[in-house]
């Protein structure tokens, strides 16, 4: 848990939820939004760590539902998790991460959700590549949301960040283009990807609620 961004008093959570779906955009600033969501997510993860030994699935499922709910509330639509594949011979569907369809002649949001990018993050770019290949580049906006990259080293009794920025640059150049990568706890190594080629837009998740309308244009 990152104490610098953890908020014990989350009375602002209700204010955020009440305003998140408004067209006028949430009243809270991006930094406070990110801290509130981080606190809600990491508190649950800590509880599971303390009460259930080795349970990694439950925190991941909770985080997926939390982020999917906030996306849906902001966009005003519910997601799907499969898409019809155009095929001349068979009817087939493609299982996906959350897909938010904004309507005719508008882009769709492709939302992978992960507690860390160590969970086979290359699949995020691979799924985006499939969507681009099947439906056309630009139809789906790739916007993964990740909790953080910290891991406890029990031997050294310290918390470390595990990041692979050079691999991300290769994925972005040679597999597919992700529009944004949102974090609740932005790693310094990935934040630097905003400044090098190919630029990967790594942002605090709170930014999404203010910039989503521009992204959807």
Model features per residue range: what roles?
Residues 58, 62, 66, 93, ...:
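Short, well-structured alpha-helical interface segments that form or flank functional binding sites
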Residues 99-109:
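Active-site beta-strand-loop-beta-strand hairpin of nuclease catalytic cores
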Residues 56-57, 87-89, 110-117:
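Short, surface-exposed loop/turn motifs that are enriched in glycine and acidic residues
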Residues 147-217:
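Domain-level recognition of nuclease-like catalytic cores that cleave nucleotide substrates
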Residues 73-92, 98-101:
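A short acidic/basic microdomain associated with nuclease active sites
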Residues 1-75:
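Interdomain/boundary linker segments immediately adjacent to catalytic/signaling cores
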Residues 57-58, 80-83, 132, 203-206, ...:
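Intrinsically disordered, low-complexity Ser/Thr/Pro/Gly-rich regulatory segments
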Residues 112-168:
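Catalytic cores of nucleic-acid endonucleases
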């Amino acid at each position: 848990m990152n104490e610098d961004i953890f908020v014990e008093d989350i009375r602002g959570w209700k204010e955020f939820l009440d305003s998140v779906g408004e067209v006028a955009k949430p009243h809270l600033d991006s930094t406070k939004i990110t801290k509130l969501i981080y606190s809600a997510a990491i508190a649950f993860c800590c509880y599971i760590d303390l009460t259930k030994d080795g349970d990694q699935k439950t925190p991941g499922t909770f985080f997926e539902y939390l982020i999917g709910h906030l996306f849906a509330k902001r966009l005003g639509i519910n997601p799907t998790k499969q898409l019809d594949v155009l095929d001349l011979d068979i009817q087939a569907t493609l299982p996906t991460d959350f897909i938010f369809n904004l309507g005719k002649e508008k882009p769709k949001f492709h939302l992978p959700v992960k507690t860390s990018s160590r969970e086979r993050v290359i699949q995020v770019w691979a799924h985006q590549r499939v969507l681009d290949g099947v439906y056309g580049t630009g139809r789906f906006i790739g916007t993964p949301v990740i909790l953080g990259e910290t891991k406890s080293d029990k031997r050294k009794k310290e918390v470390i960040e595990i990041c692979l920025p050079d691999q991300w640059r290769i994925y972005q150049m040679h597999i597919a283009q992700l529009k944004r990568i949102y974090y609740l706890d932005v790693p310094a190594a990935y934040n630097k990807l905003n400044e090098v080629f190919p630029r990967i837009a790594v942002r605090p998740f709170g930014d999404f609620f203010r910039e989503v309308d521009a992204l959807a244009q």
